[in-house]
């Protein structure tokens, strides 16, 4: 079971709700993915006016856990204000904390992230911190009270998949008891499998499903890929070797003289 701030979930897939062709396709993708948690941008809700309100009502009817985020924020002040508004709107202390440092790469500003996390943790928020694959930053986020760390595997929307598996593996090795969720950069089901094989607790993705030719089928594919990766990790994956090792025993082999 996936444990997030004292709440347990069967699914290890979290799904974003943006960019889908229609609400009906989003609904079907959520069902096929078996996800129990979806992320929502507060800016979509507030900027959308009546349409945003309808979307929130749509999500409530799905009876699913909503994780609001601070997507689009570039400063500590913006992120803290957005988090407080999200708490009022969605009636939850959970927040996926994002503070972007560069508009082109969408790389997290880790310095502002730690500062904002410290403020929000002191005000009772349960933070899901979107960060880079830097171990030291992850440790700093833990120091200020975060319990869920969400390293990227590649830039948002890039679909490149894990490009620094050594860094991700290092975070997992040094933080064995911390809940770690891969967030951003996933492009295909095999990427999600790799993330889970590294020992990560869950995967959050959006574009790879929303922009697929068949989002509903892709959602199901990701669900199964994540299950496979988790099972492989739990089973104990054979480490790669630099030399060949025979798999066929030689006991009983005939000897000719």
UniProtKB/Swiss-Prot annotation:
<feature type="active site" description="Schiff-base intermediate with DXP">
    <location>
        <position position="96"/>
    </location>
</feature>
<feature type="binding site">
    <location>
        <position position="157"/>
    </location>
    <ligand>
        <name>1-deoxy-D-xylulose 5-phosphate</name>
    </ligand>
</feature>
<dbReference type="InterPro" id="IPR033983">
    <property type="entry name" value="Thiazole_synthase_ThiG"/>
</dbReference>
<feature type="binding site">
    <location>
        <begin position="206"/>
        <end position="207"/>
    </location>
    <ligand>
        <name>1-deoxy-D-xylulose 5-phosphate</name>
    </ligand>
</feature>
<comment type="subunit">
    <text>Homotetramer. Forms heterodimers with either ThiH or ThiS.</text>
</comment>
<comment type="function">
    <text>Catalyzes the rearrangement of 1-deoxy-D-xylulose 5-phosphate (DXP) to produce the thiazole phosphate moiety of thiamine. Sulfur is provided by the thiocarboxylate moiety of the carrier protein ThiS. In vitro, sulfur can be provided by H(2)S.</text>
</comment>
<feature type="binding site">
    <location>
        <begin position="184"/>
        <end position="185"/>
    </location>
    <ligand>
        <name>1-deoxy-D-xylulose 5-phosphate</name>
    </ligand>
</feature>
<keyword id="KW-0784">Thiamine biosynthesis</keyword>
<dbReference type="GO" id="GO:1990107">
    <property type="term" value="F:thiazole synthase activity"/>
</dbReference>
<dbReference type="InterPro" id="IPR013785">
    <property type="entry name" value="Aldolase_TIM"/>
</dbReference>
<dbReference type="Pfam" id="PF05690">
    <property type="entry name" value="ThiG"/>
</dbReference>
<keyword id="KW-0963">Cytoplasm</keyword>
<keyword id="KW-0704">Schiff base</keyword>
<comment type="similarity">
    <text>Belongs to the ThiG family.</text>
</comment>
<dbReference type="InterPro" id="IPR008867">
    <property type="entry name" value="ThiG"/>
</dbReference>
<dbReference type="GO" id="GO:0005737">
    <property type="term" value="C:cytoplasm"/>
</dbReference>
<keyword id="KW-0808">Transferase</keyword>
<comment type="pathway">
    <text>Cofactor biosynthesis; thiamine diphosphate biosynthesis.</text>
</comment>
<dbReference type="GO" id="GO:0009229">
    <property type="term" value="P:thiamine diphosphate biosynthetic process"/>
</dbReference>
<protein>
    <recommendedName>
        <fullName>Thiazole synthase</fullName>
        <ecNumber>2.8.1.10</ecNumber>
    </recommendedName>
</protein>
